Amino acid sequence: MGDLWLLLLLPLSLAAFHGVKGCLECDPKFIEEVKSLLGKLVPPEVPGRTHMLERQMKEMIRLSFKVSHRDKMLRVLAVQKVVDLRTWLKIELDKLSKEKWKGVFILQGRLLDIRKNLDSKLEKLLKKFSEVACSEDCVVTEGPILDCWTCLRITSRCFRGEYCEEDDPKKAESREIGLFLILLAEGVILGGVLLLFHFCISHQRKMKAIRRSLKTYLEKKLEELMGIKDEKEKDFRGRE
Protein backbone atom coordinates (compact mmCIF):
# COMPACT_ATOMS: atom_id res chain seq x y z
CA MET A 1 0.00 0.00 0.00
CA GLY A 2 2.89 2.31 0.77
CA ASP A 3 4.18 2.55 -2.79
CA LEU A 4 0.71 3.46 -4.07
CA TRP A 5 0.41 6.33 -1.59
CA LEU A 6 3.90 7.44 -2.59
CA LEU A 7 2.97 7.40 -6.25
CA LEU A 8 -0.41 9.09 -6.05
CA LEU A 9 0.24 11.65 -3.34
CA LEU A 10 3.62 12.98 -4.43
CA PRO A 11 3.61 16.53 -5.83
CA LEU A 12 3.03 16.98 -9.53
CA SER A 13 6.74 17.59 -9.93
CA LEU A 14 7.10 13.83 -9.99
CA ALA A 15 4.95 13.68 -13.09
CA ALA A 16 6.92 16.52 -14.61
CA PHE A 17 10.14 14.64 -13.88
CA HIS A 18 8.99 11.54 -15.77
CA GLY A 19 7.08 13.52 -18.41
CA VAL A 20 3.32 13.86 -18.32
CA LYS A 21 1.87 11.50 -20.94
CA GLY A 22 -1.17 9.39 -21.81
CA CYS A 23 -1.98 5.69 -21.74
CA LEU A 24 -1.00 5.10 -25.39
CA GLU A 25 2.28 7.01 -25.24
CA CYS A 26 4.14 4.81 -22.77
CA ASP A 27 5.34 2.22 -25.32
CA PRO A 28 7.80 3.59 -27.94
CA LYS A 29 7.43 0.39 -29.98
CA PHE A 30 3.68 0.89 -30.23
CA ILE A 31 4.17 4.48 -31.41
CA GLU A 32 6.48 3.28 -34.20
CA GLU A 33 3.94 0.63 -35.20
CA VAL A 34 1.16 3.22 -35.45
CA LYS A 35 3.45 5.50 -37.45
CA SER A 36 4.19 2.65 -39.86
CA LEU A 37 0.51 1.75 -40.24
CA LEU A 38 -0.43 5.37 -40.92
CA GLY A 39 2.31 5.54 -43.56
CA LYS A 40 0.65 2.69 -45.45
CA LEU A 41 -2.58 4.66 -45.71
CA VAL A 42 -1.25 7.48 -47.90
CA PRO A 43 0.42 6.95 -51.30
CA PRO A 44 3.92 8.51 -51.63
CA GLU A 45 2.85 10.86 -54.46
CA VAL A 46 0.17 12.64 -52.38
CA PRO A 47 1.14 16.34 -51.83
CA GLY A 48 1.82 17.27 -48.20
CA ARG A 49 1.97 13.60 -47.24
CA THR A 50 4.64 14.01 -44.55
CA HIS A 51 2.89 16.90 -42.80
CA MET A 52 -0.48 15.13 -42.88
CA LEU A 53 0.95 11.91 -41.44
CA GLU A 54 2.71 13.80 -38.64
CA ARG A 55 -0.50 15.61 -37.74
CA GLN A 56 -2.59 12.43 -37.80
CA MET A 57 0.02 10.62 -35.73
CA LYS A 58 0.04 13.37 -33.12
CA GLU A 59 -3.76 13.51 -32.88
CA MET A 60 -4.06 9.73 -32.63
CA ILE A 61 -1.48 9.26 -29.88
CA ARG A 62 -2.15 12.44 -27.87
CA LEU A 63 -5.85 11.62 -27.69
CA SER A 64 -5.13 9.38 -24.70
CA PHE A 65 -3.44 12.34 -22.97
CA LYS A 66 -6.59 14.46 -23.34
CA VAL A 67 -8.82 11.67 -22.02
CA SER A 68 -6.72 10.65 -19.01
CA HIS A 69 -6.17 14.29 -17.94
CA ARG A 70 -9.87 15.19 -17.81
CA ASP A 71 -10.05 13.84 -14.28
CA LYS A 72 -7.62 12.40 -11.73
CA MET A 73 -9.84 9.33 -11.56
CA LEU A 74 -8.99 8.63 -15.23
CA ARG A 75 -5.30 8.41 -14.48
CA VAL A 76 -4.61 4.67 -14.12
CA LEU A 77 -5.62 1.54 -16.01
CA ALA A 78 -4.81 -2.15 -15.96
CA VAL A 79 -1.89 -2.88 -18.30
CA GLN A 80 -3.84 -5.64 -20.04
CA LYS A 81 -6.62 -3.17 -20.90
CA VAL A 82 -4.03 -0.81 -22.39
CA VAL A 83 -2.61 -3.68 -24.47
CA ASP A 84 -6.11 -4.61 -25.68
CA LEU A 85 -6.78 -1.01 -26.67
CA ARG A 86 -3.52 -0.76 -28.61
CA THR A 87 -4.29 -4.03 -30.38
CA TRP A 88 -7.74 -2.74 -31.35
CA LEU A 89 -6.24 0.45 -32.80
CA LYS A 90 -3.65 -1.46 -34.83
CA ILE A 91 -6.34 -3.77 -36.23
CA GLU A 92 -8.49 -0.80 -37.27
CA LEU A 93 -5.57 0.92 -39.00
CA ASP A 94 -4.57 -2.32 -40.70
CA LYS A 95 -8.13 -2.76 -42.03
CA LEU A 96 -8.09 0.78 -43.35
CA SER A 97 -4.74 0.24 -45.10
CA LYS A 98 -6.25 -2.62 -47.11
CA GLU A 99 -9.02 -0.45 -48.52
CA LYS A 100 -8.78 1.26 -51.89
CA TRP A 101 -7.36 4.81 -51.85
CA LYS A 102 -10.25 7.31 -52.15
CA GLY A 103 -8.51 10.58 -51.45
CA VAL A 104 -7.21 12.65 -48.54
CA PHE A 105 -10.58 13.93 -47.32
CA ILE A 106 -12.13 10.46 -47.19
CA LEU A 107 -9.11 9.17 -45.28
CA GLN A 108 -9.25 12.03 -42.79
CA GLY A 109 -12.93 11.30 -42.17
CA ARG A 110 -12.21 7.61 -41.55
CA LEU A 111 -9.36 8.44 -39.17
CA LEU A 112 -11.63 10.88 -37.32
CA ASP A 113 -14.16 8.07 -36.80
CA ILE A 114 -11.41 5.82 -35.43
CA ARG A 115 -10.27 8.54 -33.02
CA LYS A 116 -13.83 9.08 -31.78
CA ASN A 117 -14.23 5.36 -31.14
CA LEU A 118 -10.84 5.28 -29.43
CA ASP A 119 -11.80 8.22 -27.22
CA SER A 120 -15.06 6.53 -26.21
CA LYS A 121 -13.45 3.14 -25.54
CA LEU A 122 -10.59 4.63 -23.50
CA GLU A 123 -12.84 6.80 -21.34
CA LYS A 124 -15.21 3.90 -20.63
CA LEU A 125 -12.32 1.64 -19.65
CA LEU A 126 -10.78 4.27 -17.36
CA LYS A 127 -14.10 5.06 -15.65
CA LYS A 128 -14.97 1.40 -15.19
CA PHE A 129 -11.54 0.66 -13.75
CA SER A 130 -11.74 3.57 -11.29
CA GLU A 131 -15.18 2.42 -10.10
CA VAL A 132 -13.85 -1.06 -9.38
CA ALA A 133 -10.54 0.07 -7.87
CA CYS A 134 -12.18 2.67 -5.61
CA SER A 135 -15.06 0.50 -4.40
CA GLU A 136 -15.78 0.50 -0.66
CA ASP A 137 -14.63 -3.09 -0.16
CA CYS A 138 -11.36 -2.31 -1.96
CA VAL A 139 -11.72 -4.82 -4.78
CA VAL A 140 -8.39 -6.43 -5.62
CA THR A 141 -7.49 -5.84 -9.26
CA GLU A 142 -5.62 -8.46 -11.23
CA GLY A 143 -2.38 -7.90 -13.13
CA PRO A 144 -0.07 -4.86 -13.23
CA ILE A 145 -1.52 -1.36 -13.35
CA LEU A 146 -0.25 1.53 -15.45
CA ASP A 147 -0.11 5.15 -14.31
CA CYS A 148 -0.82 6.89 -17.61
CA TRP A 149 0.62 10.20 -16.40
CA THR A 150 4.07 8.90 -15.58
CA CYS A 151 4.19 5.55 -17.46
CA LEU A 152 5.08 3.85 -14.17
CA ARG A 153 3.65 0.50 -13.12
CA ILE A 154 1.82 0.25 -9.79
CA THR A 155 2.17 -2.89 -7.70
CA SER A 156 -0.50 -2.12 -5.10
CA ARG A 157 -4.06 -3.32 -5.62
CA CYS A 158 -6.24 -1.17 -3.35
CA PHE A 159 -6.80 2.45 -4.27
CA ARG A 160 -7.46 5.25 -1.81
CA GLY A 161 -6.73 8.92 -1.34
CA GLU A 162 -6.84 11.68 -3.92
CA TYR A 163 -7.19 9.31 -6.89
CA CYS A 164 -10.52 8.08 -5.50
CA GLU A 165 -11.63 11.66 -4.78
CA GLU A 166 -11.38 11.14 -1.04
CA ASP A 167 -10.65 13.98 1.38
CA ASP A 168 -8.38 16.47 -0.35
CA PRO A 169 -7.20 19.34 1.93
CA LYS A 170 -7.54 21.90 -0.86
CA LYS A 171 -11.01 20.71 -1.81
CA ALA A 172 -12.06 20.65 1.85
CA GLU A 173 -10.79 24.21 2.27
CA SER A 174 -12.65 25.29 -0.86
CA ARG A 175 -15.84 23.72 0.47
CA GLU A 176 -15.43 25.52 3.80
CA ILE A 177 -14.87 28.85 2.06
CA GLY A 178 -17.92 28.23 -0.14
CA LEU A 179 -20.04 27.35 2.89
CA PHE A 180 -18.85 30.49 4.72
CA LEU A 181 -19.74 32.67 1.72
CA ILE A 182 -23.18 31.07 1.50
CA LEU A 183 -23.83 31.65 5.22
CA LEU A 184 -22.53 35.21 4.90
CA ALA A 185 -24.85 35.89 1.97
CA GLU A 186 -27.81 34.42 3.86
CA GLY A 187 -26.93 36.57 6.88
CA VAL A 188 -26.81 39.71 4.73
CA ILE A 189 -30.16 38.86 3.13
CA LEU A 190 -31.76 38.10 6.50
CA GLY A 191 -30.35 41.32 7.96
CA GLY A 192 -31.74 43.27 5.02
CA VAL A 193 -35.18 41.72 5.49
CA LEU A 194 -35.17 42.50 9.22
CA LEU A 195 -34.06 46.07 8.57
CA LEU A 196 -36.82 46.52 5.99
CA PHE A 197 -39.36 45.04 8.39
CA HIS A 198 -38.20 47.38 11.16
CA PHE A 199 -38.42 50.34 8.80
CA CYS A 200 -41.95 49.37 7.74
CA ILE A 201 -43.11 48.90 11.35
CA SER A 202 -41.54 52.20 12.43
CA HIS A 203 -43.07 53.97 9.45
CA GLN A 204 -46.46 52.44 10.21
CA ARG A 205 -46.27 53.57 13.83
CA LYS A 206 -45.28 57.08 12.78
CA MET A 207 -48.18 57.23 10.33
CA LYS A 208 -50.61 56.12 13.05
CA ALA A 209 -49.26 58.80 15.38
CA ILE A 210 -49.60 61.41 12.63
CA ARG A 211 -53.16 60.30 11.88
CA ARG A 212 -54.06 60.48 15.59
CA SER A 213 -52.53 63.95 15.89
CA LEU A 214 -54.32 65.10 12.74
CA LYS A 215 -57.60 63.65 13.99
CA THR A 216 -57.21 65.39 17.35
CA TYR A 217 -56.33 68.66 15.61
CA LEU A 218 -59.34 68.44 13.31
CA GLU A 219 -61.67 67.60 16.21
CA LYS A 220 -60.44 70.65 18.13
CA LYS A 221 -60.85 72.86 15.09
CA LEU A 222 -64.31 71.47 14.53
CA GLU A 223 -65.23 72.17 18.16
CA GLU A 224 -63.90 75.72 17.84
CA LEU A 225 -65.89 76.28 14.67
CA MET A 226 -69.02 74.90 16.28
CA GLY A 227 -68.46 77.15 19.30
CA ILE A 228 -68.06 80.20 17.06
CA LYS A 229 -71.24 79.26 15.21
CA ASP A 230 -73.20 78.92 18.46
CA GLU A 231 -71.97 82.29 19.68
CA LYS A 232 -73.00 83.96 16.44
CA GLU A 233 -76.45 82.41 16.65
CA LYS A 234 -76.87 83.62 20.24
CA ASP A 235 -75.70 87.08 19.26
CA PHE A 236 -78.10 87.15 16.35
CA ARG A 237 -81.03 86.08 18.54
CA GLY A 238 -80.13 88.72 21.13
CA ARG A 239 -80.37 91.44 18.53
CA GLU A 240 -83.84 90.31 17.52
Swiss-Prot record:
The chain crosses the membrane at residues 177-197. Residues 23-176 are extracellular. Keywords: Cell membrane, Membrane, Signal, Transmembrane, Transmembrane helix. GO terms for molecular function: protein homodimerization activity. It comes from the Eukaryota. GO terms for biological process: acrosome assembly. It is a single-pass type I membrane protein. Its main location: membrane. Residues 198-240 are cytoplasmic. InterPro entries: IZUMO. Residues 1-22 form the signal peptide. GO terms for cellular component: inner acrosomal membrane; plasma membrane. It is found in: Cell membrane. PANTHER family: IZUMO SPERM-EGG FUSION PROTEIN 3. Belongs to the Izumo family. Monomer and homodimer. Izumo is the name of a Japanese shrine to marriage. This is Izumo sperm-egg fusion protein 3. It comes from Bos taurus. The gene is IZUMO3.
